[in-house]
Amino acid sequence: MKTPDVNAVFDQMPTKDIRATIERMIAAEMWEKAQEVAGKFLKKAGKEDQNDFDRGNIIHHAHQLLGRIALAQGNIELAKNELLEAGKTNGSPQLNSFGPNMLLAKKLLEAGEQEVVLAYLELCYKFWTISLQPLIEMREQWVKEIKEGKIPDFGANLIY
């Protein structure tokens, strides 16, 4: 029996499973392996057969994960850059409606990095265009609180 090609198996894995695998590696502080897998995850977004909505999710979440790894290793500048790269996605049905993941942003706010988080939110508003009044008010409240030096309650956006 022939051993399956690891890269072929990886390419067939659903996005949510790859993300969950990297999350487990981060929780176990397997930084180098998590960084390697997150890099492969990001490359998956560049594949021509990758559908558009998944491409946006992959770009967003891979950069989020790479930023969390960088921050855990003490590289704040790289973490800030990864946050901004996460915001440069064209979006997806999920990101466009539920909004961006804010876990890395929260961690950077805890490190006193308000400006990069405000810039990230501006980038996210390009794809997060849902116009329901409660969401508009929530986004405005986040910006207000960040400008006041507070850390907003990002609620479910910490786990999307």
Locate predicted features.
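Structural signature of alpha-solenoid helical repeat junctions
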Residues: 13, 51-58, 96, 116, ...
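Flexible helix-coil transition and linker loops at the boundaries of alpha-helical arrays
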Residues: 3-10, 43-56, 89-93
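Terminal, low-structured helical/coil segments at or just beyond the last alpha-helical repeat
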Residues: 114-160
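Residue register of alpha-helical TPR repeats
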Residues: 16, 59-61, 99, 119
